[in-house]
Amino acid sequence: MSGKKRTASSNRWMLEHFDDHYVKLAQKRGLRSRAAFKLEELQQKDQLIRPGMTVVDLGAAPGGWSQVAVKLVGDKGKVIACDILPMDPIVGVDFLQGDFREEKVLEALLTRVGADKVDVVLSDMAPNMSGSDGVDQPRAMYLVELALDMCHQVLAPNGSFAVKVFQGEGFDEYMKAVKEAFKVVKTRKPDSSRARSREVYLVATGYKL
């Protein structure tokens, strides 16, 4: 039964994907994923990224957010991207392939960051979905907790954090933890986020720890 559900869900996703306005627009603009529009919308509302900034992009593949970020930081800025999956090169983006939960990958990422702290941490990470909330939600919350931990390691005072979170068990506790670490936290649901998705984005500014 679960296999049939996943097949039906996969078929629905495929139909939505190929008939999706944002997918078509991404292809037209040469963007690697529709997710790029989510960061563009967050940027329009919250002005997270400015020229000259250093940005860390977690869960970067296939590169939609990195494409947007590297244009925003300009020639004097820096984008450091990391993903367990491979990603085709993007000019101006320093990409590290690996699982940053592993010590050697984390060390390599911190080496790329260097002595200076970063201005923005981005995370559009999501687990491979099984279709079971009891499995998927804990996995998703684990990833966002890792992203917040990365902020504690690399983010400069008054830095910013944008993270995709799935509403469900653990969300309220996570929101509390983010509010403890940042002066201002806003919840955003970009127009380019599918309406039926439980995903929202927390935009946190004014890092204070």
From Swiss-Prot:
It comes from Shewanella oneidensis (strain ATCC 700550 / JCM 31522 / CIP 106686 / LMG 19005 / NCIMB 14063 / MR-1). NCBIfam families: PRK11188.1. This is Ribosomal RNA large subunit methyltransferase E. S-adenosyl-L-methionine binds at residues 63, 65, 83, 99, 124. Belongs to the class I-like SAM-binding methyltransferase superfamily. RNA methyltransferase RlmE family. Keywords: Cytoplasm, Methyltransferase, rRNA processing, S-adenosyl-L-methionine, Transferase. One of its GO terms (cellular component) is cytoplasm. It is found in: Cytoplasm.
